[in-house]
């Protein structure tokens, strides 16, 4: 809220905080624990508060990021003596140049039956995925991608909303060393082509539709257009998020739009297409992931 002082200058009044953490929560916070590590390693640094820690983090860049690396216990096959090279270049700076690691391996390190992801669609459909189940799903899709020839440096795209299957596809692609790119299915066709056309993906994960403003919106016609235009695509993987494309009750649903590895559906529109759920079932016995560690 703003007001003016006696000389007509704008003065901002601070509103009362909506919420404050308890002392117990502050003590258990990761930032508090990290500050204690910094204070132990660098006794001369005042790390007692965020305001005190921040100036050090941006003036002693190498020390700060080395502490972050160690505190996070990053999984890597090779660590790096150098933290950052050419820091004055932006872009151009190189971080931990000798390290080899995998993004997905670090994100999937936790196991157990605790909830890893909560997905809630606009229509009210809610799913919870445990850390164990997430790892299993990623293992299956990674195996499917590998069998399809996806290798380090290949591009995998997602024409997907923010749902569990999107996270699974991203982690599966990055576990293999592939590059992930995505955009929402409510993008217009040209907007999608401007993004995906540049990276030339080998595989496209695409939702059959999405929910918005109380309605289910079909995406399959747009997916068909994208598949026809991107010559690099070797596989389209359809994720069934809506039960059936609106106004196509007589078309046979999603399966009738697919060709390629879907048996018994010759009157179709999307070439080289498979169902995400079929990939999961086919590779359900895969329980481990061979993470590709890269520089």
Placement of each model-derived feature along the sequence:
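Short beta-strand->loop structural element characteristic of the AMP-binding/adenylate-forming
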Residues: 157-160, 166, 170, 174-226
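AMP-dependent adenylate-forming
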Residues: 36, 40-45, 104-133, 244-247
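A short N-terminal helical cap/helix-turn-helix that marks the beginning
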Residues: 66-80, 97-118
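ANL superfamily adenylate-forming
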Residues: 123, 203-295
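Conserved AMP-binding/adenylate-forming core of the ANL superfamily
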Residues: 52-56, 117-171, 188-193, 267, ...
């Amino acid at each position: 809220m703003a007001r003016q002082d006696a000389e007509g200058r704008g003065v901002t009044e601070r509103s009362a905080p909506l919420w404050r953490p308890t002392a117990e929560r502050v003590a258990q916070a990761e930032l508090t624990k990290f500050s204690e590590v910094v204070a132990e390693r660098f006794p001369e640094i005042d790390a007692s508060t965020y305001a005190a820690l921040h100036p050090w983090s941006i003036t002693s860049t190498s020390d700060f990021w080395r502490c972050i690396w160690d505190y996070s216990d990053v999984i890597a096959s090779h660590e790096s003596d150098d933290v950052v090279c050419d820091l004055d270049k932006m872009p151009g700076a190189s971080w931990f140049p000798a390290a080899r690691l995998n993004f997905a391996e670090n994100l999937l390190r936790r196991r157990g039956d605790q909830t890893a992801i909560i997905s809630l669609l606009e229509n009210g459909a809610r799913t919870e995925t445990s850390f164990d189940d997430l790892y299993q799903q990623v293992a299956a899709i990674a195996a499917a991608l590998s069998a399809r020839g996806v290798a380090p440096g290949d591009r995998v795209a997602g024409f997907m909303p923010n749902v569990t299957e999107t996270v699974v596809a991203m982690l599966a692609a990055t576990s293999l060393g592939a590059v992930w790119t995505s955009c929402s299915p409510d993008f217009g066709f040209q907007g999608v082509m401007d993004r995906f056309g540049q990276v030339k993906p080998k595989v496209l994960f695409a939702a059959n539709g999405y929910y918005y403003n109380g309605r289910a919106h079909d995406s399959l016609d747009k997916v068909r257009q994208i598949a026809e235009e991107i010559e690099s695509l070797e596989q389209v993987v359809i994720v069934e998020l809506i039960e059936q494309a609106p106004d196509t009750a007589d078309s046979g649903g999603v399966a009738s739009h697919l060709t390629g590895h879907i048996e018994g559906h010759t009157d179709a529109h999307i070439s080289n297409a498979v169902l995400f759920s079929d990939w999961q079932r086919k590779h359900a016995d895969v329980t481990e992931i061979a993470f590709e560690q890269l520089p």
